[in-house]
């Protein structure tokens, strides 16, 4: 049975039926589809378009379908065109002809737009919750490891920072990610139900009632816009892409830091794998997979942008392709957020190695230049002097703090004994606004 067909002389071919069906993926929307239908029926009864008896029968049937799906008694599968057909045809089989009144003053165009907005809002809030949990994990990791380490530019040791300050940079990145998702939810928080196919309906329905019952702040203002655009999905996937970019950058650093070349951290066995041939290997596969899966979300974004870029108003079947892009990107970003939280919550920082890396990198060179500036030298001249000292130290395989005062005075007479205290690594992060590094 189909929800259409009166104007056709021939049946749809099996090839086309399979090609056209979206049930294999839009079945994820069953809860939203039934919820939307129930509110629609309540509104029809409120507006005297359905009788009280008719609405009660339809609501009871919809509740039984939802209950059976939730309890595993009814599988969402079969030769149905989509989730809407599945629900409506099952409803007809259960309660008879009255079920055919369910779709009064509604099109599948506004129905699917509603389902998708409800689903996107619900799942986006789940992403927000996982971001907040990851932020808590990051903050806790930083508080436990407020130790000095090298800060980098160009992947070259640059200045002293703390592990806490470094990892908290990601906390603030994820804070903005969270705010972007919440903003996207706010923008999509309008109900398309009642837009029908593209031009509303001649029935005097109550769109404000359905919007309020479904948790939206208001109905959409324009019928065509309500059923024609998926910009809210594109915005969400764009936000997910930025989250994945941040997760990927963090993953890359974890991969580097866990290598023997850095040896700053230990990733727990729970989030590592081994080699089938090399017994000694412990591979950071969790971080590598997050880095790799970033491309999947980027792909979903570009795919949906490409799908939407050339289609005229209103609904076109191309838009069926929006579901899998959101589903795939949602599944990916949620799993990656959870894996990152697990990985960071079990991470161990090697304080000895982070400190040794600081000593070997001339990371107090900028502070040494500042010392000379404080003694009256222009910064550009101080920069040149310290550069010459670094060159000298490299040749001698020594650190700035390890060369004698007599040696320093060969480069500038401004050096005094207090220079060693000034360029001490711990002291450098307790001076000026560097105190904020903690």
UniProtKB/Swiss-Prot annotation:
SUPFAM superfamilies in the cross-refs: L-aspartase-like
Keywords per UniProt: Amino-acid biosynthesis, Arginine biosynthesis, Cytoplasm, Lyase
EC number: 4.3.2.1
Pathway the protein acts in: Amino-acid biosynthesis; L-arginine biosynthesis; L-arginine from L-ornithine and carbamoyl phosphate: step 3/3
S-S bonds: none
InterPro entries: Arg_succ_lyase_C, Argininosuccinate_lyase, Fumarase/histidase_N, Fumarate_lyase_CS, Fumarate_lyase_fam, Fumarate_lyase_N, L-Aspartase-like
Gene Ontology CC: one annotated term: cytosol
Compartment annotation: Cytoplasm
Primary location group: cytoplasm
Transmembrane feature ranges: none
Record GO biological process: arginine biosynthetic process via ornithine; L-arginine biosynthetic process
GO molecular function per UniProt: argininosuccinate lyase activity
Catalytic reaction(s) noted: 2-(N(omega)-L-arginino)succinate = fumarate + L-arginine
Entry similarity comment: Belongs to the lyase 1 family. Argininosuccinate lyase subfamily.
UniProt-listed PANTHER family: ARGININOSUCCINATE LYASE
Protein name stated in the entry: Argininosuccinate lyase
